[in-house]
């Protein structure tokens, strides 16, 4: 399970298994590195993609399901494939959120609520029977190209004043943004693996990904 006092780097794979097979074995094993099966990756490769990730990485695997309904089945699918954490959208019905959190607890998985598109994350949390392990403050991929869109760190103190949860910062994270996230109280920074032609910010898959991972870990210490 994730620990409150540790700062984590989450590296997101959003493309295909070819990229996973090429890059993942080069990343140094570290308890502070989480490997994410991104939503586009899961849609493309299915549960088998998560399973292959788990075979290549003996650390924590995050299944970015972004569940909106059918919570129990999706959590069980991710767990059976080897994931140790999974995400649900904060905009999902409260019944779905509660079922998701309960099933994650039963399976000893870390539950993550992704607040993508949610204006007031605290209001979502106040409706729940129990809080998640992680709250994700997320600037979406499509928002990255809109000038002035930012990760809303202003919510961190509000959330942490009421709940003992970890905060994850996602969306357009580079070394500078990672430093800002930690300064503002985040516990996890999510960095996308991107191609040179993408409009998004992250670690370019053509770079020395292992070295970039080390730089991020040093930055968020």
Where are these regions (language model features)?
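Conserved anion-binding
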Residues: 2-5, 73, 77-164
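Structural motif
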Residues: 30, 56, 81, 130, ...
